[in-house]
Regions:
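Catalytic Walker B motif of ABC-type/P-loop ATPase nucleotide-binding domains
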Residues: 94-97
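Conserved catalytic motifs of ABC-family nucleotide-binding domains
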Residues: 90
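Short helical segment in ABC ATPase nucleotide-binding domains corresponding to the A-loop/adjacent helical element
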Residues: 30-38, 48, 52
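Conserved ABC ATPase "signature" region
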Residues: 45-64, 117
Length: 184
């Protein structure tokens, strides 16, 4: 029951990834990743090891990237740093709010694949918010479709595709299929 948990403690147990990365522009990649572990009182050696481990996880060489600043990174690199910053303190829950919405399609597909790999290997719960149905179907073990604040369907991707529960879900999937056939 989360209502019994101190709100600050609760928030520190959630990793957040947002659309525009939210990286601190005046801090290096290493310091951005180290923020929450430092707040939690981790020692310097543990933080440094975790920063390097996480950069390796997303294929960013620590020797090359730890001292760079966000402005020196591509959009995809910034998203990778934003993702590992959220993972830095090993939260049980990850909240990802349209993290891949502002990057090109090739980088987006690559990041989606990386996220799937990380999710499979982490054992953590990921809540991923997106307006892209294809992305939801690719990344979700369960997909929640909401229209005007009302739940339309909550199901595994295969079930959602096979048995849309409402006219809205049917139309949403049909629009997505039309876009996919058109190459968009």
């Amino acid at each position: 029951d989360v209502s019994t948990i101190d709100p600050v403690t609760l928030r520190r147990g959630i990793g957040y990834v947002i659309q525009q990365t939210g990286l601190f522009p005046h801090m290096s990649v290493a310091k951005n990743i180290a923020c929450v572990p430092a707040i939690l009182g981790w020692d310097r050696d543990r933080i440094d090891a975790r920063v390097d481990e996480l950069l390796d996880l997303v294929h960013l060489d620590p020797a090359v990237f730890r001292d760079r600043y966000p402005a020196q990174l591509s959009g995809g690199q910034q998203q990778r740093v934003g993702l590992v910053r959220a993972l830095a303190a090993s939260p049980d829950l990850m909240l990802l709010d349209e993290p891949f919405g502002a990057i090109d399609a090739i980088t987006r597909a690559s990041l989606q694949d990386e996220l799937l790999r990380i999710h499979r290997n982490s054992g953590k719960t990921f809540i991923f918010v997106t307006h892209d149905v294809t992305e939801a179907l690719k990344l979700g073990t369960k997909v929640l479709v909401i229209d005007e604040g009302r739940i339309q369907q909550y199901a595994e991707p295969d079930e959602l595709l096979a048995r849309p529960a409402t006219p809205f879900v049917r139309e949403l999937l049909a629009c997505q299929a039309t876009r996919a056939m058109a190459g968009g």
